A protein has these predicted regions:
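Short linear capping/connector segments at secondary-structure termini
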Residues: 44-48, 77-83, 113-115
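...with weaker cross-activation on analogous glycine-rich loops/strands in unrelated enzymes
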Residues: 63, 96-175
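Generic recognition of cysteine residues
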Residues: 76, 88-91, 125, 130
């Protein structure tokens, strides 16, 4: 008799969870809760990043800003630090431009300062990789960088590079 009681209780608990899950799915149209689970990935099309449909506004804005300078500007040391709109950008100037577009920084930052920007570790949507000599960002699964991309100057790549030797940083607020 004790065994049957335990089985009945377990089935009742399982039924409650099933009803709760079905109700939650119906309330959201069958989609997952925003912010739950893995984030979408941007697509690369003709040298520009296309944001995923589930990307937060700050991420979309950062991608759009990066697209403004991707492969349309040359690389130059110090580029993008004197003013936001520049003829050329260096690595940290390009990353800063994208972060500024997403309203995550107010002023351009050199790579050494990006090592200390935001919070430690990888972000859900944007991770900045920085050391004293170089910086790049991974935004919605695509790498925005001034090296190891097609062409010259800032650009996107779906090929990742090693993060070894870089500090990993992310925006310190929920995007």
């Amino acid at each position: 008799m004790l065994f049957r009681t335990r089985i009945s209780l377990a089935l009742a608990v399982a039924a409650v969870f099933a009803v709760t899950a079905a109700s939650a799915s119906a309330e959201t149209g069958g989609t997952s809760t925003p912010g739950a689970g893995p984030t979408g990935e941007a697509k690369l099309q003709d040298g520009e990043a296309i944001p995923p449909s589930d990307a937060p506004t700050r991420v979309i804005n950062a991608i759009e800003a990066a697209n403004e300078i991707a492969k349309g500007h040359d690389y130059c040391m110090g580029g993008g630090h004197a003013r936001w709109k520049s003829q050329c950008y260096d690595c940290s100037g390009a990353v800063s431009f994208a972060l500024h577009g997403g309203r995550m920084i107010d002023d351009p930052m050199p790579s050494g300062s990006l090592e200390k920007w935001g919070e430690k570790g990888k972000g859900d949507w944007i991770t900045v990789y920085a050391n004293s000599g170089h910086a790049f960002a991974v935004i919605a699964g695509l790498r925005f960088d001034t090296s190891m991309t097609d062409g010259k100057g800032p650009g996107w790549s779906d090929e990742m590079r090693s993060g070894r030797g870089y500090k990993k940083r992310h925006f310190n607020d929920k995007i």
